[in-house]
Amino acid sequence: MSGAIAAAVLAAFGQDIYNSIFHRPPGPLGGLPVLIDHSSEIVREGYFVALPQKAQLQNSQLKSLSTGKPEAYDWAMARGGAEGPRTSIKLVVEGHREHAVKIIGVEAVKERCHEPLSGSLFAAYSAGGEENISMLFDLDAPRSLAKEPGGEDPSMLSDYFEVHSISLTRGEQQTLVLNATSEKRYCEFKLKFTVVDGKSTVAQWVDDSGRPFRVTSLRKFNEYGSLYFGGVSTYQCGGGWVRRDPQSFGDQNPYSFSGGVGC
């Protein structure tokens, strides 16, 4: 509200009503000890999304995706797609008790895993950076506990909560960017937060708006049914999304590919 409206409310109704509108105390303390918000969008400069089925897009559809109506990422994810070989999740956690609460563990709990997706691949290459990662989860491990980010081999990384904890007072917020990876398979998972709330330890679960999060390892180019390139790889062709024959790129790994896609 504007300052003029606030002043009018103060003049008309007095200090008590003014305070109830403009200086509301934090919400009720019932419910879980940590509020976890998954509504923040991650910054994706580039990505790989694989579909379980082969998608044969017409030129008109590619033109629509190239103009961002809809975004190719959203279009593919809405059709059962999964990012690979990692997916990033941004969460905002907030303390919801009069006393400080402490997050002492986060685990990616796998619900089901199987062979990596092979229907279609959308490969959007990027020349930019990424958001700073808070924690890493290796979904190829027997248990996918939060690890310190950094390094090439997730199995060699330190457990995040062996040296850290996240303490939150009432209303205090912290943003977490979590990366879940797989080099071997497709997995669906949820996140389990372990929180110390006074004398109790509470488990809080986070999913993707009622569905599990998804991630898939990447296959070689020639193992996909159809292939689409976007991002900086198509700038020389005028930008946007282009369709290419997966067999033309042989057994190269999409993640490490650095060649041209042709115009």
Where are these regions (language model features)?
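Long, charge-dense
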Residues: 112-154
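Ser/Thr/Pro-rich, low-complexity mucin-like regions
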Residues: 179-202
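Membrane-aqueous junction of the first/signal-anchor transmembrane helix
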Residues: 1-65
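Short, solvent-exposed beta-strand/turn "edge" segments of beta-rich domains on protein surfaces
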Residues: 73-84, 92-101, 116, 167
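Short, hydrophobic/aromatic beta-strand segments
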Residues: 99-107, 117-120, 147-149, 188-190
